[in-house]
Amino acid sequence: MHRKKVRQFIVTSSSRNQVNLLVEYLFNGFNPFEFIISSEDVELKKPNPLPYLKAIQLSGINKNNSIVFEDSNPGLISSLAANLPTIFVPSNIPIVLEKNIKLDCILDSLGDENNVANVIKGPKLKKSYVDYSFLSDYLVSFSNAKN
C-alpha cells in the first residue's frame, strides 16, 4: 500500500504508547501511518463513531474513498455508524457478530504471499492476499450497493 501511496491511519481504543510500541516492532522503526487516533484523542471511544469521524476530518478524505479494517464488534459498530466502507477481519474465530450488524466484506485474514486470505463474504481476491486491486474493487462494490 505504501508503494501505491495509499494513505493509512490507525483508529484504536488502545493507548498511543501501546500502538507506538507495536508499530515500532512490526515495521522496524518505519511508520507507514500518517496519524493515530488513540483512546487519549477522543472523549467517546468505540463503539461510538467519533474516533472514525475524527480520522476522516483530520485526513480530509471523502468517506466513500476510505476503507476501514476492523477486528472487533465495538470497532464495527463505530465504523458502520460513521457510514464508512468496512472490511471485517475478525481477531476471534468463530465469528460472533452482534445482532443488526450488516457487512458486505468479511475476511479471515489479510493474507500475504505465503498465507492465503479467505473471503467469507465480499468480492473475490485476485491474489492470495488483500492488495490494491481488491480494495479498489471493494470500494466500487460498496458504492454500487449504496446506490
Q: Where are the predicted features?
A:
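Short, acidic loop-to-helix structural element flanking the phosphoryl-transfer center
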Residues: 1-10, 16, 20
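Asp-based, Mg2+/Mn2+-dependent phosphohydrolase catalytic module
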Residues: 15-147
